Amino acid sequence: VELNKTVIPTSKATGETTEKIALDLIRDGEVIRHVDDWTSLKGESLLLPTGTYVVKAYSADKDVHAVGFEGKAYYAGQTDVKVEKDVVKPVEVSCKLAQCMVSVKYSDNFKENFKAYSCEVKNQYGSVEFVQDESRSAYFPAADLIATLSLTNTDNKSFTLGKSITDVQAQYHYSIKYDVTNEGTGDFNITVDQTTHNYIVSI
C-alpha cells in the first residue's frame, strides 16, 4: 500500500455567497455586539469608543466539530481593528473553511476486480460511510483520519484494508483514490488539494 501526497493550489473563491455568516465584535474578551447575519450591518456605521477590537466572523447555526456531507461546512475568520478618534475605518474579514474535505474514488481497474466496496472514514469526532460510487465530499474537523476499505472480489472473498492519514489540516481537500496495479497489489493514493473556499466579509 502506497500513500502519495501532493499539494494542488487553487484560486480563491469569489462572488456572492449563500453562507449565513454571524459576526461578533469583541473587546477585552467580551462580546459587545453580535449579529446572526453580517449582511444586516451593510451600510451601517458603528460608533465605538477608541481602542482595539477583534471582529470575529463564523458560520451561523453550525457546529465546527460536525462530521458529514452537505450543510456541514464551517467557515471562520477574525481580524483585529484599532478604533481611533474621528477616523472611519472599514473592516474586512476573510472567512476560510475551518475543516478539511474528504472524498473517495476508485479506478476503473479497481471496479473491474471487486463487485462490492465501500470506505468508512473516521476521526475522533465521527465517521462517514462512503458507499459504493458515492461522489460527494464530506467535511471533518481537522484531526488524524482513518480510512477503512471493505470490499468483496469477484470470487466472493471479502477483505478490509485500513490506512491512517496524519497531519490533517483545515482548508485542505483529501482525495482518496483506490487502485489495483497490474501485479495485483493495491495502491492507496491521496491527493491533497489546498482549497481555499474563502468568503470575504466587509463592513
Predicted features, each with a name:
Residues 1-26, 33, 40, 45-50, ...:
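Extracytoplasmic cysteine-anchoring/structural motifs
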